């Protein structure tokens, strides 16, 4: 443990805000603490200092990160601020502290809306998320929010006078559609979870479609789960639109399939099921040819 007396403190001053103090010896910040004046020991130098409300400290912490990684916060003298803004926007991975703060504040607002029980709040959260995705502001926080919206009412049921008040299939459907814009392994896991737990064919269809757009099929996990879903709904609630989307997803994932026999069997079950429309069964015969040839 470092000697507390040897630890030096520096202050970062941002116009219009109170100074933020951090340890110059270990160059670290202590964990965020609840609101109020709380004495927090430095994680490395064991020196205590006072921290204010976390909402105020968030802006300062972003400023520290920006200076540490060389992100421009204020334009240099003799330069045009608009030029710096254009360069920052064009670099892709660079953003100003103000932009980072707005993204953080946006995430807080969306999280509160997602946690709300009301339907209207969740609709508004989806609108905010869609605007963020269209603006190129995708993040892990948005992915987590969409995952929560996609499972709203599935694993936590709230009842009032015996009536379920948090079952929102339209919210789950739209969340599954938006998850396709954030392709990752976490997105794939969230969609598979929705697909296995939801009873609404429309929501399951949206999850299946998004899985095809994400395109991740490690060890045939995605196609195997889709095959199980196909057999499940074929037995309890055969739906032509769901079967058609399953076929389309099989076609998209054909290049990633290892065990083609299992996929072909699932497709042929749809083709041989007389409860589906002729167009769906004809589509199954088209897809099976592509799967056999490896999606070529």
Curated annotation (Swiss-Prot):
It is found in: Membrane. The chain crosses the membrane at residues 59-76. GO terms for cellular component: membrane. This is Uncharacterized protein TP_0608. It is a single-pass membrane protein. It comes from the Bacteria. Keywords: Membrane, Transmembrane, Transmembrane helix. InterPro entries: ARM-like (IPR011989), ARM-type_fold (IPR016024).
């Amino acid at each position: 443990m470092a000697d507390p007396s040897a630890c030096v403190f520096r202050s970062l001053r941002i116009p219009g805000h109170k100074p933020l103090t951090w340890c110059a010896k270990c160059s670290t910040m202590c964990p965020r603490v609840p609101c109020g004046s709380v004495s927090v020991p430095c994680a490395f130098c064991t020196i205590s200092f006072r921290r204010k409300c976390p909402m105020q400290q968030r802006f300062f912490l972003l400023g520290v990160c920006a200076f540490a990684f060389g992100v421009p916060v204020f334009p240099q003298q003799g330069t045009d601020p608009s030029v710096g803004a254009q360069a920052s926007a064009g670099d892709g991975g660079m953003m100003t502290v103000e932009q980072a703060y707005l993204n953080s504040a946006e995430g807080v607002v969306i999280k509160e809306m997602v946690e709300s029980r009301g339907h209207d709040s969740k609709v508004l959260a989806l609108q905010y998320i869609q605007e963020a995705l269209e603006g190129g502001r995708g993040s892990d926080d948005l992915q987590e929010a969409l995952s929560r919206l996609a499972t709203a009412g599935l694993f936590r049921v709230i009842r009032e006078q015996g009536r379920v008040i948090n079952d929102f299939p339209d919210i789950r459907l739209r969340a599954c559609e938006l998850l396709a814009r954030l392709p990752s392994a976490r997105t794939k896991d969230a969609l598979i979870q929705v697909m296995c737990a939801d009873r609404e064919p429309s929501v399951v269809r949206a999850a299946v479609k998004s899985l095809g757009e994400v395109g991740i099929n490690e060890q045939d996990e995605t196609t195997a789960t889709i095959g199980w879903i196909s057999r499940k709904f074929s037995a309890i609630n055969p739906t032509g639109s769901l079967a058609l989307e399953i076929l389309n997803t099989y076609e998209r994932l054909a290049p990633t399939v290892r065990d083609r026999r299992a996929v072909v069997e699932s497709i042929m079950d749809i083709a041989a099921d007389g409860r589906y429309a002729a167009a769906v069964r004809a589509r199954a015969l088209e897809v099976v040819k592509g799967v056999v040839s490896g999606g070529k």
